[in-house]
């Protein structure tokens, strides 16, 4: 897939509509997860990491071990999907992880936890979608226990290799096994919507445009 082309051509609504038409009705995350900037677009393949809330931190234990391993292993166009079970006191993402990920040409980060260093990340224009913003470190509060294992975010199943697309409207997760079909159909729907838009701009009635294309 040409992720740069998809990033500039697709949008979350058309992917959601495509999934609906195929019978996948629960692939959109709730509105609680937002981009750090409305212009950010998340487009890539998931790498899932699962955090566990902790109540005691032994200084002899490296709580960052698996987190570092996951981030350092990111490939171009991959999205770090960090699952904190909506514990907003866990902030798994910040400026330094963004810096490393951007160097690796990763596509961004998606988390239901918190993110910090927001000012710097916005300046970097690195796509980050998060459930909350806060200054807390994940140390003493959470630890990444597993990665590249099945997970769930806001009730939506997610696996490493799934296609992640997010924009100002929301985030959609496309299962890996249907990604190629969904992308093809979504691109076709974009072309059809462009035709309908042109018709409406030239005075064609909404009823006529819908009758001809079935798109609204």
Language-model region placement:
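Feature captures the catalytic cores and cofactor-binding loops of soluble hydro-lyases/lyases
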Residues: 1-160, 174-216
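Channel- or pocket-lining gating/hinge segments that regulate access to a cavity or pore
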Residues: 170-172
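Acidic and generally charged, gly/proline-rich low-complexity regions
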Residues: 163-166
